[in-house]
Amino acid sequence: MTADHNKNATDNLLLLSSTLQGLTSEGINARSERLDEMSALEIAQLMNSEDQTVAHAVEKVLPAVAKAIDAAHDGLAKGGRIIYVGAGTSGRLGVLDASEIPPTFSASTSLFHAIIAGGQAAIFEAQEGIEDDRAQGVVDLDAANVTEIDVVIGLAVSGRTPYVLAALEEAQKRNAITIGISCNPGSELEQQADIAITPEVGPEVLSGSTRLKSGTAQKMVLNMISTGAMVRLGKCYQNRMVDLNITNEKLRARALNLVRELTEADKEAALHALVEANWNVKVAIVICKTGLDAAAAFDLIQSAGGHLRQALNEAK
C-alpha cells in the first residue's frame, strides 16, 4: 500500500509539473531574465512596462465581462448574491472586492460574499495546501447556502485549482450562474464556467508570482463586474456615488457637495434637504429638484426601483 501510494503521489506530481509548464502564467518572461541583476529603478521600470500590457489583455475579454455584469445585475435584482470563491491571492482579491461594496454603495453586507480556501486565517497568512482540497470546496460552498438566484465567481489564475473547480461544480448543481476568471486559455475553469473571462497577461516578471500581472487583471475584472452591477441597480446618478453610507464628517461633507453639484442648490438649502432626508443623498436631491417633502421623495425613489434618474424623470 505504501509503495503504491508513493508511486501515485509521484505520478501525480510529475503530471502536475507538466501541466504547470504548459500554463502561460507559469512561463518564463524573457524581459526579466536579468531581474536579480537590475537596479531598483530598472525593476520598477520593467514592472511598470509589463503592467501596461494588462489593460490590453483585459480589453480583449470585455464582451465576456459585459455578460458577467448582466448576470451579476440580474442575480442581485432577483434578491440573490454575488459569491466569490478563490484560494491564495485570488481568494484575497475576492475578499477585497466584497468588503468594498457596502461602504461604496451603501449596500447590505450580505449581497457580496467571499469564500477563501482556508477561511479567515488565509486572508493574513498563506494556507496554500487547502487549494488542493476538492471536498472542502464543496463544504464551504454548501455552507454559503447557494441557490439558483446567486452568482458564483470562481477565481483561479491557473484555471485548475481543485478547491475552486469543486465549488463551481457544486454551484452548478444548485443551478447558480457561474463565472470563471483565470489567465490561462483552455483551462478547466474556462471550460466549466457558464461565463468564462480569461485575460491572457503572459508570463510574470517574477516567474510564477501570479499576484503581479495576473492579480492585477483579476482585480480589474472584479472592479468592472461589481461596479457595473451596482450602477445598473441604481446605485449611482451620472457618475456620482449617490448611495453613500454616511458614517463620518468627511462623508457628510461629500454628501453636501454632491447635493449642491447635482441640484445647483446653495449650501444652506442642500444642508436643510439632507437633514430632512436623514442624510439620504438621493432623497435630498429629489427634494431640492422637485420641492417634494422627504416622505414623498423617498416614495418616488422607491417606485423607481432606486434609480434616481428615473425618479426625477417621473417627477417632471
Where are these regions (language model features)?
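Cofactor-/ligand-binding subdomain signature composed of acidic, glycine-rich
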Residues: T2-A57
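Gly-rich Lys/Arg/Thr-decorated short loops/hinges at beta-loop-alpha junctions or inter-strand turns
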Residues: S25-E26, L46-V54, A114-E125, Y237, ...
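Short, basic, glycine/proline-bearing loop/turn elements
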Residues: E50-K60, A126, V151-G154
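A short, well-structured juxtamembrane/interface segment
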Residues: K60-G75
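Glycine-rich phosphate-binding loops that contact phosphosugars or nucleotide phosphates
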Residues: I83-V221, A229-V231
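Short, amphipathic alpha-helical interaction segments embedded in low-complexity terminal/linker regions
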Residues: A229-K316
